[in-house]
């Protein structure tokens, strides 16, 4: 190792700070953009120009530094949920805009200057408090043998005890997690250990039906397998949670190894069969596995921008690819002749159809299948969409999709991305095929996290 004095100018998706020196990219965990640090730097891995530093001390704090209100952020190890938690809103905005700009530059994409970051008002409590409609917590056991549920430390599978209550989530979630932990402490069940691949309880997932006329609260216990002990326990837990105001309880079975939060099968245990939430004036059903953005206020802004830009007209057909449970499909269907949604998750498509019926929308149709498989079928069927919405997962588009879309009579499309790097990669492909970016904007749906959405 060598001791280096570094200035942090960038941040990785993991939350580690990045410094550049003598052609070397140095990752510095725990450091923030604008920090000046003294660190011990490992030699670069063979064949690379990247290295990892062991943080020693900050010699000068970032000009954007601000004390975090969350005790889990300053714990050691710190919670991995909010790597940017010690930056001002202005600092976070600059960092997130920079993530998009650097991704575009690295891919050689010529684009107009991004519009200002779409963010919650700085004076709004929702910027940092109680804005999430979903929490995922992992089990831990303290030295006295008491269970707790918390978020993982950055880059690890260690649940940070101080993160049992996250100020970004509604208070009821911490109380429900505490109830589950207290009852598990008296049971014979054990936390799942990914390294040894043994144990019972893998995680809990809680979801809030925001904008509901009455509280709608969903609790899911995710376990490795449905043993007799698990069945008995979840029955007792569900009874207690229902007494405390939870309205829907599920048991999720996750028998396979890996980091996926939930398994494929969820069993309804008690209460309603899911909850509801409102987006853009429409109501959507929510179950444990339903994908929805976790920041309701920012979701409204994000979707409104996407729909304003794509501007579906009353005589047009619109494609919504990677449509999930049909949120933007149904919102767009209100102003176009026909909206067609495609998603690989069959359960999401079934929910999308139910959501269409729930909202009385008859001009939306849905297809279950991979986009790269369904597009040729749609083209062969003679569909002639004029506009499209693309909202893929973190990995972006499959390699064949840009050319398939170019073969359609599209006049425009909107791309909503959760990963600047894959967005920039895909944008470069579209530009090669003759498309151009007219405008784009970063959007902040995760205050405190090194994550940025993009609308283009």
Q: Predicted regions span which residues?
A:
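Terminal RNA-binding accessory module
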Residues: 1-75, 156, 319, 373
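Short edge beta-strands and adjacent turn/loop segments
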Residues: 198-212
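Rossmann-like S-adenosyl-L-methionine
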Residues: 3-5, 13, 228-455
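Extended interfacial segments that mediate partner engagement and assembly in macromolecular machines
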Residues: 56-71, 76-193, 227
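Short, aliphatic-rich beta-strand segments
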Residues: 206, 213-225, 283-287, 387
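Residue-level signal for inorganic ion chemistry
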Residues: 19, 34, 82, 204, ...
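A short, glycine/Asx- and small/polar-enriched loop/turn
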Residues: 127-133, 213-215, 450-452
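Short beta-strand micro-motifs enriched in acidic
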Residues: 31, 40-45, 138-142, 207-211
């Amino acid at each position: 190792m060598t001791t280096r004095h570094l200035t942090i100018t960038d941040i990785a998706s993991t939350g580690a700070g990045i410094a550049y020196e003598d052609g070397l990219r140095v990752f510095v965990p725990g450091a923030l953009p604008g920090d000046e640090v003294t660190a011990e730097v490992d030699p670069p891995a063979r064949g690379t120009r990247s290295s990892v530093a062991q943080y020693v001390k900050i010699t000068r704090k970032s000009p954007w530094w601000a004390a975090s209100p969350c005790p889990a952020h300053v714990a050691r190890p710190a919670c991995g949920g909010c790597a940017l938690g010690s930056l001002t809103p202005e600092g976070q905005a600059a960092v997130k805009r920079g993530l998009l700009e650097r991704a575009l530059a690295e891919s050689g994409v010529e684009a107009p200057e991004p519009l200002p970051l779409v963010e919650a008002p700085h004076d709004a409590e929702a910027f940092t408090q109680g804005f999430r409609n979903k929490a995922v917590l992992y089990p831990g056991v303290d030295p006295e043998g008491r269970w707790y549920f918390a978020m993982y430390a950055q880059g690890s599978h260690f649940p940070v005890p101080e993160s049992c209550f996250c100020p970004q989530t509604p208070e009821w979630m911490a109380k429900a997690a505490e109830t589950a932990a207290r009852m598990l402490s008296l049971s014979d069940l054990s936390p799942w250990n990914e390294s040894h691949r043994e144990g019972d309880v893998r995680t809990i997932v809680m979801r809030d039906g925001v904008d509901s006329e009455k509280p709608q609260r969903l609790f899911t216990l995710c376990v490795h397998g449905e043993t007799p002990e698990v069945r008995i326990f979840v029955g007792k837990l569900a009874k207690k949670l229902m007494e405390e105001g939870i309205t829907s309880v599920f048991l999720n079975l996750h028998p396979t190894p890996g980091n996926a939060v939930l398994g494929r099968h969820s069993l309804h245990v008690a209460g309603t069969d899911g909850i509801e939430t409102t987006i853009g004036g429409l109501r959507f059903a929510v179950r444990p596995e339903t994908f929805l953005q976790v920041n309701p206020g920012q979701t409204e802004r994000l979707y409104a921008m996407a729909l304003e830009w794509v501007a579906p007209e009353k005589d047009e057909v619109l494609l919504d690819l990677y449509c999930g449970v049909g949120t933007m499909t149904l919102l767009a269907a209100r102003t176009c002749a026909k909206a067609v949604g495609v998603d690989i998750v069959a359960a999401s498509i079934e929910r999308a159809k139910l959501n269409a019926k729930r909202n009385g929308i008859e001009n939306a149709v849905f297809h279950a299948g991979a986009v790269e498989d369904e597009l040729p079928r749609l083209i062969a069927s003679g569909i002639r969409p004029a506009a499209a919405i693309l909202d893929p997962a973190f990995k972006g588009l499959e390699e064949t999709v840009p050319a398939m879309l170019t073969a359609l009579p599209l006049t425009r499309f909107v791309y909503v991305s959760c990963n600047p790097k894959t967005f920039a990669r895909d944008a470069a492909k579209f530009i090669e095929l003759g498309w151009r970016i007219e405008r784009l904007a970063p959007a902040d749906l995760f205050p405190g996290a090194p994550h940025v959405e993009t609308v283009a």
